[in-house]
Design a protein with these regions (language model features):
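Short, intrinsically disordered low-complexity segments
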Residues: 35-65, 70-78
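Short, low-order "capping/linker" segments at domain edges
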Residues: 80-83
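Extended, hydrophobic alpha-helical segments
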Residues: 1-34, 38, 42, 46-47
């Protein structure tokens, strides 16, 4: 399935910058970077659960945010790429 992950990590503190590096590195290992904080991840259901869990553990929910867009297995008709 295709899952698009977008994140915003507060980097005002040293801990925030460390969280950002951790989230970015994990996403880079799992998916393809589309923008600085947006990744396209082709995963199965089990990998998706691990992805979500690991990212939830990495952020500070009071300062940071995550978004998961679940496009499923038939995502080709839902995604248009120009340029």
């Amino acid at each position: 399935m295709l899952v698009v992950v977008a994140y915003d990590v507060n980097t005002e503190t040293k801990e925030g910058r460390k969280r950002l590096r951790h989230v970015a590195k994990f996403c880079t290992n799992v998916g393809i970077r589309l923008q600085n904080s947006v990744f396209e991840c082709h995963v199965d259901a089990a990998e998706c659960k691990v992805l979500k869990h690991r990212l939830e553990q990495a952020i500070d929910t009071e300062r940071d945010s995550l978004r998961f867009y679940y496009l499923g297995n038939r995502y080709q008709s839902k995604v248009e790429h120009i340029g």
